[in-house]
Amino acid sequence: MKRFTVCCFSNKIHKNGDRNPDKKSRESMEVSRKDNEEPEKQNNNNVASIIGSDRTNVIVNHDFSSGMHSWHPNCCEAFVVTAESNVSHGVLDPSKCGSYVVVKNRKETWQGLEQDITNRVKPCSLYKVSATVAVSGPVHGLVEVMATLKLESQQSQTNYQFIAKTCVFKEKWVRLEGMFSLPSLPEKVVFYLEGPSPGIDLLIQSVTIHRESEPELERVTAEDETIVVNPNFEDGLNNWSGRSCKIVLHDSMADGKIVPESGKVFASATERTQNWNGIQQEITGKVQRKRVYEATAVVRIYGNNVTTATVQATLWVQNPNQRDQYIGISTVQATDKEWIHLKGKFLLNGSASRVVIYIEGPPPGTDILLNSLTVKHAEKIPPSPPPSIENPAFGVNILTNSHLSDDTTNGWFSLGNCTLSVAEGSPRILPPMARDSLGAHERLSGRYILVTNRTQTWMGPAQMITDKLKLFLTYQISVWVKVGSGINSPQNVNVALGIDSQWVNGGQVEINDDRWHEIGGSFRIEKNPSKALVYVQGPSSGIDLMVAGLQIFPVDRLARIKHLKRQCDKIRKRDVILKFAGVDSSKFSGASVRVRQIRNSFPVGTCISRSNIDNEDFVDFFLKNFNWAVFANELKWYWTEPEQGKLNYQDADDMLNLCSSNNIETRGHCIFWEVQATVQQWIQNMNQTDLNNAVQNRLTDLLNRYKGKFKHYDVNNEMLHGSFYQDKLGKDIRVNMFKTAHQLDPSATLFVNDYHIEDGCDPKSCPEKYTEQILDLQEKGAPVGGIGIQGHIDSPVGPIVCSALDKLGILGLPIWFTELDVSSVNEHIRADDLEVMMWEAFGHPAVEGIMLWGFWELFMSRDNSHLVNAEGDVNEAGKRFLAVKKDWLSHANGHIDQNGAFPFRGYSGNYAVEVITTSSSKVLKTFGVDKEDSSQVITVDLQGL
């Protein structure tokens, strides 16, 4: 068939998204396909007043037929050139091209021509701007001309909203086009044209501003109607364009081997030179903020000998303040063999002046094929019911013959061609973590499985458990393990589960001696498997493996929480005595007292992002329910300096202003990040001297700018899992980072921060390794002041978490959960997981704070971990979070004793006390309870009662 092609001309912008730490310069469609063509002279009549019809021009005297009426030069001069004036400006003859205005004597780039349009625009409407412009004078090459809005209000500073820009050659008419929308109407809105360098004359032939769509609140669209125009290419390539590449329409490709999955045609994005090149459509004005949309695309790839590649749907959003945002909607692993469905959701927190959806991802040279793309308002998914678990049998081992009581391995089989036998001499006591869960329990048999003739690391004992597992029940794993002699390096031993084709980590330990070691882990299944087995693996081939007392049993979480509540009463509450003064004791003896805690001072914070604070509903939940905050990306080096020397602290400043103005304390996350994949390419390319200078500059810039504003800093994130800076600059660099940070901001507590500390899943970051690292830093002079446990945990079990806290608590440093999140498709189970973690943290004396790693759907790092649905509904996990926080408030009722006192026991924080005398007189006072162990006496003045 005949091929139709469309190309896109582009200008450069910057991409600020966490999925690309390099923040390389990206291109976007800022000039339409006809931007460089000479437009015809526009002769439509202007209607000067009203904003009624969508096609009414907002601009008065749009073609200067009434001279300079309604137009004003901005700190420069302007005049109109007409055919009758017998004056031309360069080669532009008004008798041929029509009248135009000349803006001259410009001494600044922002000087140009303006018009007040305040009374002719509406909030939330989308407007399209089209201006015919040229330049004259000392012009060399291309010159930029921009359209801008000036927004003035008495209550705030003047803001400027970029609309569009175009490149102009000398004395050649070019059309400048763009769109804008105002979320609210300021006191004054001024449209103006600006941009050429001082001394260059700006020429304007006509300006139109038409309303493209009605306000969002007035718009009524069917819920199942896609906002993408021509989604199946039935109208060819209309409304589609290439994102800095070519797009082509096909009915087939590859000699007929590739045909559409549906419809008659499909499009390809070809001649791609960057991963982000692809096919796009502008959907400005069609998406409403704070509403969830679902995008569905049918895609595949072709060419360049690439058979599989990641394809991604992305949203580019330009905010009214010209801040660019890239939202990754979804990814899929596409192939050249078949069409694949890509599906994902997105939400806009704030207002947008432009929105473009596009498909990107494969390596350069590989074509993206698109059969269809739809974007619809997402259906609300009904909440999942609480799972019904019959006879959970808490504490009962589901494995057969764990004790090897008949001296055989009946019930077990060897995974691989290894040999299983029974031997004597293993520990007879339960491993500590299992003992904490099971309490009093029969002793182990002392027999173990000896695994010999191992030729692969995965070889070991195994048992099928398919029919023994129950959905949504959390299981704890416990076992003693040991390795044979002859090892010359540390050996990892792992309890693993094969759930259909998925490998599940049931706990790991590193062994470097001939002693028995405990493995403790946990897991849960959320859909019925066709096959499930448990096995023990890990040492190198040729090394014997010994396994004793392996147990898998369901955990009674409610019993654990009851224990923790009693623990919290001991370690978090203190005795308080209210001493009432100010009047004769006889007047208030026996008066009733009602004490209510208003706020617990224990830090409970959350991660936030810059885009989140544009959403009023998000901010409202945040301010009501958290007293600390941490920034997801906006303080990280790859965000603040994506390109060398180009610093961006505006996002962090905006977020810090919100927090400080609402008495929210903040953690600084993070100064450096040791994992190489998170380090900007320009840093990775540096030699040792330049890198060392860059590190010092980063410390100086960040710590001086925010001195005294962040209570904590994660100095060098994830040092147990990465070593980029240490490898490049030597072992002392980590210590020097801590020392320099402390010198620059002595008020901040400096933390280490890492993951898989608390779950038994990673021998790299077990509590023992973390302790060793912290002690090593301190011995070399690093002022480590706090321990960060990230807390990205699956199926948490209290005693396993508590064991890690106990081991780290010996160091005497404050422990914080810095990035806590839990995940389950079932909101009730997610709520259980979160409740477990909150009580374990609150119930341990070494823990001094909890930070959630987000709470709002579509803005979490893990699926199925949110507490609030994207459109603002609090789900079951969120309700449980609020309920736990409510449990952390102390209340007391009683009467004033004969000594004028009222004793009670309560958590630290802010309180209100109401005193009611026998004559029904009332007085309400507030007071605070400090965090201490000893009793606190608080005097309450009742004068006037």
From Swiss-Prot:
Top-level EC class as recorded in UniProt: hydrolase
GO biological process: xylan catabolic process
Tissues expressing this chain: Predominantly expressed in vascular bundles, but not in vessel cells. Mostly expressed in stems, at lower levels in roots, and weakly in inflorescences and seedlings.
Active site: E718, E819
Region entry Disordered, spans: 16-50
Pfam families assigned: CBM_4_9, Glyco_hydro_10
A GO cellular component annotation in the UniProt record: plant-type cell wall
Biased composition (Basic and acidic residues): 16-41
A molecular-function term among this protein's GO annotations: endo-1,4-beta-xylanase activity
Domain remarks: The GH10 domain binds to xylan.
Role: Binds to and hydrolyzes insoluble and soluble xylan substrates. Exhibits xylanase activity.
Family: Belongs to the glycosyl hydrolase 10 (cellulase F) family.
Name recorded for this polypeptide: Endo-1,4-beta-xylanase 1
Lineage: Eukaryota, Viridiplantae, Streptophyta, Embryophyta, Tracheophyta
